[in-house]
Amino acid sequence: MIDNQHKTVLLYEAVDSLNIQNDGIYIDATFGRGGHSSLILSRLGSQGKLISIDRDPEAVKKAKLMKDPRFSFIQGSFSDLYHYVKKLDLMGRINGLLFDLGVSSPQLDDAKRGFSFMRDGPLDMRMDPSRGLSAAEWLMKVNVENLAWVLKNFGEERFSTRLARAIVERNRLNPIKSTKELADLISHVIPVRNHHKHPATRSFQAIRIYINNELQEISSALNAALEILSLGARLSVVSFHSLEDRIVKNFIRQHSRGPQILRGLPLTEIQIQSMWQPKLKLIGKTMPSQKEVLDNPRSRSSILRFAERIN
């Protein structure tokens, strides 16, 4: 039941990395439009199970179309992964867990969701429009200092303070209500440095990440993975920008290599091992092929990292 209008990035590579077992129990923590879930189901045997999660209303509609007794769907955030699995009494029994982070193409292409500076629509940006403040509402409340912090830390925007002042001042005079209004303001304030990249790219990313608490949710879900996965299970994560990938890379490194021990400390290797045991084994990373990037330019920045649960 794959959405023909949505090209799932690293589709086969991500599912291959899960090393599917016929009778295994798998979680697709970011159902989206069902691309990964459909392929996982095609590789499962009759006794296998797939649990998919998403909070996006359009994803919920797609999931309802998947009529398969091996498939179940949870409407919610993947940051609550631990609680979902505990409620299902499946702790330590999950054979594979997949995350496909960020915003999907259908979300970007739907103007009324307010994610894209390329399509004019209400300035919303919420993954779940029924919860929390929209981007427009938040921008009306935030002060210059806090907005500049978000733009700098979540968008790596060099002109964060200048832009924050302009947004707050504009909202004081005439509230920003649409994506086009915000994009036009950003384009006016920020000098064009890269003609291949819209000046609003970083700011829209930063605001979206903040509105949806994305980075904290990723960290929470990754920590839950260590509790829910069985020995030998796979953890696979597709990320799309450096902030996401840094969290994933550091998490896998931390739980496969262990803490950094300062040189000169009087500790033997046996003492260090007694204090800490690795929980993950790095298996590899994959980036899209040249053909995939040509077919789907949005895949260009993606990277898949995958590891195995050990000990």
Curated annotation (Swiss-Prot):
The keyword Ion transport does not apply. It catalyses: cytidine(1402) in 16S rRNA + S-adenosyl-L-methionine = N(4)-methylcytidine(1402) in 16S rRNA + S-adenosyl-L-homocysteine + H(+). It comes from Hamiltonella defensa subsp. Acyrthosiphon pisum (strain 5AT). HAMAP family: 16SrRNA_methyltr_H (MF_01007). It comes from the Bacteria. Gene3D superfamilies: Putative methyltransferase TM0872, insert domain (1.10.150.170), Vaccinia Virus protein VP39 (3.40.50.150). Disulfide bonds: none annotated. GO terms for cellular component: cytoplasm. It is found in: Cytoplasm. This is Ribosomal RNA small subunit methyltransferase H. InterPro entries: RsmH (IPR002903), SAM-dep_MeTrfase_MraW_recog (IPR023397), SAM-dependent_MTases_sf (IPR029063). Belongs to the methyltransferase superfamily. RsmH family. Keywords: Cytoplasm, Methyltransferase, rRNA processing, S-adenosyl-L-methionine, Transferase. S-adenosyl-L-methionine binds at G34, G35, H36, D54, F78, D100, Q107. SUPFAM superfamilies: Putative methyltransferase TM0872, insert domain, S-adenosyl-L-methionine-dependent methyltransferases. Its EC number is 2.1.1.199. Specifically methylates the N4 position of cytidine in position 1402 (C1402) of 16S rRNA. The gene is rsmH. It holds the Pfam family Methyltransf_5.
